[in-house]
Curated annotation (Swiss-Prot):
Protein name per UniProt: Protein-glutamate methylesterase/protein-glutamine glutaminase
Catalytic activity annotation: [protein]-L-glutamate 5-O-methyl ester + H2O = L-glutamyl-[protein] + methanol + H(+); L-glutaminyl-[protein] + H2O = L-glutamyl-[protein] + NH4(+)
Residues covered by the CheB-type methylesterase domain: 154-348
Keyword Cytoplasm listed: yes
Length: 355
């Protein structure tokens, strides 16, 4: 049985979340709290397996409560947000910076066409997060200096440096991407294209949050633009993203793949066709297998590929599947990915890689 603490200042919303969570036979809401201070007390008294956390609360808000919990009694925290306004979403992602593992929108109300899907998603994420051993796994990345070239590793021969980096992430991806992008040097010489599975409405706020710590400009990708060196392009809500022969970004309403639009597989397939061995591609933490087969395709085309290791992943789904398929040239802990990317795009014929 998964024991959950629900932290929400609105009594109506609190009862709604309790109703959804208790509808699953594997979940029990063992305690509730109306603000951050009550949450700290309930945590000490009940020791839940997972906490769902509101952001805007009296006395102690969700960001402050998350930080205190992660410093004193680390517990998997899922942020449940009632707003997709970019300014407020930025605050929501501050809770990720403080140690929360996932962000979800508040499920749609009973009778709404999206109620069942959003309620099911919340239950699914709570179950997944209950299996995560929280050890403040990204704390050591924060405040780190930009990635250096001193990472020791095997030598790989390349006839030319990479021309593009593509990355896919899902559950646990936001803090992983923040850790990587904040550690890349300011003059990173190639563009970076990213697909991050995220609930519709959160991407703009997520990009704003990344901009606060990244040394590189971060954008939501736009139709027809040519990716610039040292810029980061995030696939937008509800669009598939690919590149065409000149390297320009193309956004489509093609069908979802692996239940996702944007899909990592969709982007990776296009990059394999257009860039082939001139690409560096990787899969980070996340559930499912989106991008795993296509990472193997990229490797077969001569691209350098990587997968995040199990120890530093929140959920070792996509990356784990890629490793099982033999799709990853390298398996890397999160804290070494930025240095490896920096080395891979360096302008030299032989590139040392992080391991």
């Amino acid at each position: 049985m998964i024991n959950v603490l629900v932290v929400e200042d609105s009594p109506v919303v609190r009862e709604f979340l309790i109703y959804i969570l208790n509808s699953d036979p594997d979940i029990t809401v063992i305690a509730t709290a109306g603000d951050g201070e009550e949450a700290i007390d309930a945590l000490r008294n009940h020791r839940p397996d997972v906490i769902t956390m509101d952001i805007h609360m009296p006395k102690l808000n969700g960001v402050e409560a998350t930080q205190l919990i992660m410093e004193t009694q680390p517990t998997p925290i899922v942020i449940v947000s009632g707003s997709t306004d970019p300014a407020e979403v930025g605050t929501t992602f501050d809770a990720i910076d403080a140690g929360a593992l996932a962000v979800l929108p508040r499920p749609a109300g009973i009778g709404h066409p999206d109620h069942e899907a959003t309620a099911r998603k919340m239950i699914e994420v709570v179950k997944l997060m209950s299996e995560v051993k929280v050890v403040r796994r990204w704390a050591r990345m924060r405040g780190a200096s930009p990635a250096s070239h001193s990472v020791r590793a095997p030598l790989l021969n390349r006839v030319a440096p990479a021309r593009i980096v593509v990355v896919g992430a899902s559950t646990g991806g936001p803090p992983a991407l923040e850790a990587i992008l904040s550690s890349l040097p300011k003059h990173f010489p190639v563009p970076i294209l990213i697909v991050q599975h995220m609930t519709t409405g959160f991407m703009e706020g997520f990009v704003q949050w990344l901009k606060n710590s990244s040394n590189l400009p971060v954008h939501i990708a736009r139709q027809g633009e040519l990716p610039l060196p040292g810029h980061v392009y995030m696939a937008p809500d509800e669009y598939q993203m690919k590149v065409e022969n000149r390297g320009e970004i193309v956004l489509t309403k093609d069908e979802p793949e692996h239940g996702s639009r944007p899909s990592i597989s969709y982007l990776f397939r296009a990059v394999a066709r257009v860039y082939g061995h001139d690409a560096v591609a990787g899969l980070l933490t996340g559930m499912g297998r989106d991008g795993a087969d296509e990472l193997r395709l990229l490797k077969e085309k001569g691209a350098i590929t990587f997968a995040q290791d199990k120890e530093s992943s929140v959920v070792h789904g996509m990356a784990g599947e890629a490793i099982r398929l033999g799709a990853a040239t390298m398996v890397l802990p999160l804290e070494k990915i930025a240095a490896a990317l920096t080395n891979l795009v360096a302008e030299r014929g032989e590139t040392k890689l992080g391991a």
